[in-house]
Amino acid sequence: MAPIKVRYIVDDVDATIAFYTQHLDFIVKAHPAPGFAVLQRGDLNLLVNAKNGQGGAAQAMPDGRKPEPGGWNRIQIEVDDLGGFVETLRKAGLRFRNDIVTGFGGKQILLDDPAGNPIELFEPPSK
């Protein structure tokens, strides 16, 4: 079975690499060009493309729209202690879209990467 891949469009590939490797335990699997990198965490490969890059992911659609960062679709990273993890990230100056919310399935918060792409940090309920 092929690995899971998700593509994010970003403003700055190097800033994105630093963010994901320093704060979320991703590793750099490949960085073959300034406008593209593959980051890995477990079974997830995160493909990051510069919004103005030369590759196909940055090309305009037939109607003229161009890919851009942001939106609401996101990856989810499960953590054991959401409150403690969020506190560490806040001290590092990272941006969150909201505060921790608790629902039937657990606790979550939305963290923005440097380009404004969301990452859901999630803590399941205690068993």
Q: Where is each model-derived feature located?
A:
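Vicinal oxygen chelate
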Residues: 1-5, 27-78, 84-112, 123-127
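Catalytic core of Fe(II)/2-oxoglutarate
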Residues: 9
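Conserved active-site tyrosine of GNAT-family acetyltransferases
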Residues: 16, 20-23, 89, 116
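Short glycine-/small-residue motifs
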Residues: 118-121
